[in-house]
Design a protein with these regions (language model features):
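Non-heme di-metal
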Residues: 1-148
């Protein structure tokens, strides 16, 4: 029988890449946290009272990009990685990392956005109004979708 590669599609479930299963186990059992656990009330106080107007403006302009990056990275794991590595262990790793990026990290950044009153599409999409931020977001998106 030919040795199965990580890039081979496989309908069975025999474990061949235990390091991927260990990664998933570590993520879910030792590193797992949720956006609801993370407190942002002190961030809100710091934003209001400790930052200068200029610093506040920078934070407000960067937050939508952080959220966008989390969504791009989540999509990379399900749309690119999962297609390149169709073995069961890689599929499990892909959906786990994508879940962390989308359901935890992106939700955490959104929690910050809500605390700062930046939770409307006018804010979420504001990076598109800045050519540098728009270019950066496009570059990251393209990079994560590339064949390289």
């Amino acid at each position: 029988m030919k040795e199965r590669l990580i890039t081979d599609s496989y309908d069975g479930y025999e474990l061949r890449y235990p390091f991927l299963v260990e990664h998933v186990k570590t993520q879910l059992e030792k590193q797992f946290w949720t956006a609801t656990e993370a407190r942002v009330d002190l961030d809100e106080v710091e934003m209001l009272y400790a930052l200068t107007d200029e610093q506040r403006n920078v934070v407000k302009r960067l937050l939508p990009l952080f959220l966008r990056y989390e969504l791009y990275v989540g999509s990379f794991w399900t749309d690119t990685y999962a297609k390149l590595f169709p073995c069961p262990e890689a599929q499990e790793a892909a959906v786990t990392v994508a879940m962390v990026e989308r359901a935890i990290h992106a939700r955490f950044y959104d929690k910050i956005n809500k605390a700062f009153g930046l939770d409307k599409d006018i804010h979420y999409l504001s990076y598109l109004d800045d050519p540098a931020f728009k270019g950066r977001a496009k570059w990251i998106g393209d990079l994560l979708k590339s064949d390289d």
